[in-house]
Curated annotation (Swiss-Prot):
Organism of this sequence: Tityus serrulatus
One of the record's GO molecular function terms: peptidase inhibitor activity
Signal peptide start-end: none
Record's protein name: [des-Arg1]-proctolin
Main localization (coarse): secreted
Amino acid sequence: YLPT
């Protein structure tokens, strides 16, 4: 996942 992409950290936001």
